């Protein structure tokens, strides 16, 4: 009977480990799906920004470093 109880305890431990691993696997899968969704969204935003940058027209106003200082300097 002692061996039977030890085997039952061992099986119970293994079943618990499997249950925890299945839960962890589900959580990791959910995180992976969410990350892929975020990556897809960022790629769309990156393409949008790249297109905006291509269409960017430089301004006729000089940058502050290119401006001549005012007369009182």
From Swiss-Prot:
Q: Which cysteines are joined by disulfide bonds?
A: none
Give the top-rank taxon of the lineage listed in the UniProt record for this protein: Bacteria
InterPro entries of this UniProt entry?
Answer: SlyX (IPR007236)
Matching Gene3D superfamilies: 1.20.5.300
The record's section on HAMAP family has: SlyX
Q: Which family does it belong to?
A: Belongs to the SlyX family.
**Protein name as annotated:** Protein SlyX homolog
Name its species. Haemophilus influenzae (strain PittEE)
User: Could you tell me the gene encoding this protein?
Assistant: slyX
């Amino acid at each position: 009977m002692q061996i039977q109880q030890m085997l039952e305890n061992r099986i119970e431990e293994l079943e618990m480990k499997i249950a925890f691993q299945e839960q962890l696997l589900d959580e990791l899968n959910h995180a992976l799906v969410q990350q892929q969704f975020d990556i897809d969204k960022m790629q769309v935003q990156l393409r949008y920004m790249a297109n905006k940058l291509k269409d960017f027209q430089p301004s006729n106003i000089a940058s502050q470093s290119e401006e001549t200082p005012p007369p009182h300097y």
